[in-house]
Amino acid sequence: MKKLILHEINSLPPLPSSVIELDDYKNTDNIDVEQLIEIIKKDPLMVANILKVANSSMFGFRSKIETLSRAINLLGVKFTVSIAIGSAIQNTIKSNLLAYAVSNQDFIYTSSLATNIINTWISAIDFDLKNELLLPAFLQEVGKFIISEVIQKEKRTEEFLQELNETKDISFCEQKYMGFSCGRITANVFKHWNLSHNIIFPIAYAEDLESCPDSFKQKAQ
């Protein structure tokens, strides 16, 4: 399985230019909303996913959010960037989550929920830490697309689903079938794309804090 995972990761196409632009934008101190809108509008899928999240029951806004600018205003710049990058990465991997019996839209929703928890809880404690954790929180389960692809190619989908139903322990099943945690696979996907250690390390060591470099332990907890 390990060789199959590495093959899937090494076969991934390069990230689209929009993700690189968003990552550069995220790392600037000067937040220009109009510039962000111009970057996101280049990718209709990004726009669609941002609007779906903004109109989801998670937020419960009274009126329908129909424009990107209003969505950014309500969700916040950092949250919006996380959704945009996450949807672009999902589309780049071009896989599905059939092995987990969930849809890609379910993935976007649950990832947004994890990000919203960080956005709500951590911001009251440490605003700077919150901004650093939003993107890792959204992206931490990306490895599931690789796992699902490998499971399907090995024709073990029914077996994997049965194990999930019996154990109710996703992490255990992933480790058993893959030999790696989802976090480790996700981290290796992002290492393949040369993404920042600020994204990779909190995900890679979330379940192995003892091995985590000291400078990243707070982010991985």
What are these model-predicted stretches?
Residues 1-153, 170-195, 203-219:
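Conserved alpha-helical "signature site"
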Residues 151-168:
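Post-HEXXH active-site segment of zinc metalloproteases
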